[in-house]
């Protein structure tokens, strides 16, 4: 047994008393569902709730397939020392996952230069750092629900919307020095020097505000509400800060800029059959999500950066988007957690990165098909060998689609590390799926590999429904809308080449800067750590309603 394997510690803990490489095991001797402290808690609550609601049947673990035929495994959240029950990684049971999704949905970036040009050129009003600071005070009053223009306007209780605020950033160091530090996202402080210079060169002298609409708003409404909520308060705040007349024609320009022209949303609108507005998970492109995650600011390890992106994306795309928005089921959690528990994907990715570093060097070779074939084959065969050598590893990833996703993710990321190219990376993924199917005759459930069979040819297509650079693809890309166990890993492959190159951002420098924000409840520098805290019930979310409900409820 090779003790260097990253996943062995977790396997020994999960299957205590069984060697990871043991070929034989036992069944029906572990206590059934009662071996799980969480399921016992569920049962106790369910009995009380059933009585409370007049005997209407409720949760009963004795219904259906017998639970606990084997060990009901704990899961180690990869990159942490936290062992948690699988139930606590379901997004409904995990406040951190909920907050991560909310923090994305409630964010909108709005350019300020159009509004400033209207003020100066149409209205003859001077815009200075002092007036910008005054405006930012006004928007931080109005955005949470404070009135600024009219009397007799109802307002929102600040205690319900403490998480709501607006911040500002710019690529102009001179302007940044003059802005109120309380509301400034300081690129020079938040990013390593080389990354900061790269970001500022892209942003230039332009100025942007980042608005965080209250969590409770996106819980009650949806992501499509966010730009409207933001725009209304922007208009009111400009009127207040610059002493404008609410009815004059120039106000229409503010409205157009705040609602449309200068708006950067986190996700695009969905087609009618999926019926979701902008800023919903299904519209978040893979490169956009890679920029939302902030690990690249604090780590120069390409594998770690990519793994953190995959973990957060697993919760967003597989658990919440496909698992609930699109499917409505509870079973998608296990597909997602395969990518961020028990250090299994970590082991495969670090093996691949070491192979690449030794043979090619990080970003040390051109993206050719020979390189894709070599790296993807090596990493895929290594991954499959681990499942064959360690039966407990096979039991941990009990589904073929879990194994296919994890092996292919490692192959794709490793190929991207070598080439600094996401197209090569995604072709590494596609080759891995084909190799895996050749080895095992199948991957996962029927149709799991539909998108993988046509993927390589589409990666080089220019047809609008087939070809798109990988970073700009997302859950809404036609062939990617089908199956679980793909989208999170695609996000990691979008991140991997940029992490290898040391890029400051993946797709959009504005989104990268907007989430370099220490005041967000979810820690985007370390999604796995936050998710673990949520599973351990140690994460404090935003948007709670205690102030307006009866005490003791």
Swiss-Prot record:
Query: What does the entry's cofactor note say about binding and number?
Result: Binds 2 coenzyme F430 non-covalently per MCR complex. Coenzyme F430 is a yellow nickel porphinoid. Methyl-coenzyme-M reductase is activated when the enzyme-bound coenzyme F430 is reduced to the Ni(I) oxidation state.
Q: Which residues bind coenzyme M?
A: 335, 446
Which Gene3D superfamilies would you find in this protein's record? 3.30.70.470, Methyl-coenzyme M reductase, alpha/beta subunit, C-terminal (1.20.840.10), Methyl-coenzyme M Reductase, Chain A, domain 1 (3.90.390.10)
Residues found modified as Pros-methylhistidine: 260
Q: Which residues bind coenzyme F430?
A: 150
**Statement: the UniProt record of this protein carries the keyword Metal-binding:** yes
Q: Name one GO biological process term.
A: methanogenesis
Quote the PTM field.
Answer: The alpha subunit contains six modified amino acids near the active site region. Is methylated on His-260, Arg-274, Gln-402 and Cys-454, probably by the action of specific S-adenosylmethionine-dependent methyltransferases. Also contains a thioglycine at position 447, forming a thiopeptide bond. Contains a didehydroaspartate residue at position 452. The methylation on C5 of Arg-274 is a post-translational methylation not essential in vivo, but which plays a role for the stability and structural integrity of MCR.
Q: Tell me which residues bear (Z)-2,3-didehydroaspartate.
A: 452
Record-listed 5-methylarginine modification sites: 274
Instruction: Read off the InterPro entries from this record.
Output: Me_CoM_Rdtase_asu, Me_CoM_Rdtase_asu/bsu_C, Me_CoM_Rdtase_asu_C, Me_CoM_Rdtase_asu_N, Me_CoM_Rdtase_asu_N_sub1, Me_CoM_Rdtase_asu_N_sub2, Me_CoM_Rdtase_Fd-like_fold
Please write the reaction equations for the catalytic activity of this protein. coenzyme B + methyl-coenzyme M = methane + coenzyme M-coenzyme B heterodisulfide
Q: In which pathway does it act?
A: One-carbon metabolism; methyl-coenzyme M reduction; methane from methyl-coenzyme M: step 1/1
The answer to keyword Transmembrane applying to this record is: no
Molecular function (Gene Ontology), one example? metal ion binding
Keyword annotations for this protein, in alphabetical order, are: Metal-binding, Methanogenesis, Methylation, Nickel, Transferase
Quaternary form? MCR is a hexamer of two alpha, two beta, and two gamma chains, forming a dimer of heterotrimers.
What is its biological role? Component of the methyl-coenzyme M reductase (MCR) I that catalyzes the reductive cleavage of methyl-coenzyme M (CoM-S-CH3 or 2-(methylthio)ethanesulfonate) using coenzyme B (CoB or 7-mercaptoheptanoylthreonine phosphate) as reductant which results in the production of methane and the mixed heterodisulfide of CoB and CoM (CoM-S-S-CoB). This is the final step in methanogenesis.
NCBIfam families linked? met_CoM_red_alp
> What is the protein's name according to its record?
Methyl-coenzyme M reductase II subunit alpha
Its source organism is Methanothermobacter marburgensis (strain ATCC BAA-927 / DSM 2133 / JCM 14651 / NBRC 100331 / OCM 82 / Marburg) (Methanobacterium thermoautotrophicum)
- The UniProt gene name for this protein comes to mrtA
């Amino acid at each position: 047994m090779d003790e260097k394997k990253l996943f062995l510690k977790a396997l020994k803990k999960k299957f205590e008393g069984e060697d990871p490489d043991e070929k034989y095991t036992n069944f029906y001797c572990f206590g059934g569902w009662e071996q799980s402290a969480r399921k016992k808690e569920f049962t106790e609550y369910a009995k009380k709730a059933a009585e409370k609601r007049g005997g209407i049947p409720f949760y009963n673990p004795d219904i259906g397939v017998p639970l606990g035929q084997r060990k009901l495994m704990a899961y180690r959240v990869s990159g942490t020392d936290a062992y948690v029950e699988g139930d606590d990684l379901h997004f409904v049971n995990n406040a951190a996952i909920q907050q991560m999704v909310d923090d994305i949905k409630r964010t909108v970036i709005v350019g300020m230069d159009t509004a400033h040009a209207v003020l100066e050129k149409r209205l003859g009003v001077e815009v200075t750092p002092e007036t910008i600071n005054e405006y930012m005070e006004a928007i931080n009053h109005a955005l949470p629900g404070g009135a600024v223009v009219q009397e007799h306007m109802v307002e929102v209780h600040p205690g319900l919307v403490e998480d709501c605020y607006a911040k500002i950033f710019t690529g102009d160091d001179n302007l940044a020095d003059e802005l109120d530090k309380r509301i400034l996202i300081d690129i020079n402080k938040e990013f390593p020097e080389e990354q900061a210079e790269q970001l500022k060169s892209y942003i230039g002298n332009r100025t942007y505000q980042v608005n965080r609409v209250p969590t409770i708003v996106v819980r009650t409404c949806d992501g499509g509400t966010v730009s409207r909520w933001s725009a209304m308060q922007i208009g009111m705040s400009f009127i207040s800060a610059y002493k404008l007349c609410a009815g004059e024609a120039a106000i229409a320009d503010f409205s157009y800029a705040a609602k449309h022209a200068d708006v950067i949303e986190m996700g695009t609108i969905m087609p009618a059959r999926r019926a979701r507005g902008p800023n919903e998970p299904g519209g978040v492109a893979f490169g956009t999500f890679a920029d939302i995650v902030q690990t690249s600011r604090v780590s120069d390890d390409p594998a770690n950066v990519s793994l953190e992106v995959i973990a957060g994306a697993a919760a967003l795309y597989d658990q919440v988007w496909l698992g609930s928005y699109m499917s409505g089921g509870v079973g998608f959690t296990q597909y997602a957690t395969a990518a961020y528990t028990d250090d299994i994907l970590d082991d495969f990715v670090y093996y691949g990165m070491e192979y690449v570093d030794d043979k090619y060097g990080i970003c040390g070779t051109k993206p050719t098909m020979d390189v894709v074939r070599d790296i993807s084959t090596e990493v895929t065969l290594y991954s499959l060998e681990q499942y064959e050598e360690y039966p407990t590893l096979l039991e941990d990833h009990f589904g073929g689609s879990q194994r296919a996703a994890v092996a292919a993710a490692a192959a794709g990321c490793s190929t991207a590390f070598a080439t600094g190219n996401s197209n090569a990376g995604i072709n590494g993924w596609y080759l891995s799926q084909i190799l895996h199917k050749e080895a095992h005759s199948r991957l996962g459930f029927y149709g799991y590999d539909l998108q993988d069979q046509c993927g390589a040819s589409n990666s080089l297509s220019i047809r609008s429904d087939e070809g798109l650079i990988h970073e700009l693809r997302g859950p809404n890309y036609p062939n990617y809308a089908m199956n679980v166990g793909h989208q999170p890993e695609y996000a990691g492959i979008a991140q991997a080449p940029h992490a290898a190159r040391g890029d400051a951002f993946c797709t959009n420098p504005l989104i990268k800067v907007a989430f370099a924000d220490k005041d967000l409840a979810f820690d985007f520098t370390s999604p796995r750590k936050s998710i673990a805290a949520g599973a351990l019930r140690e994460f404090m979310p935003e948007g709670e309603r205690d102030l307006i409900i009866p005490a003791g409820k």
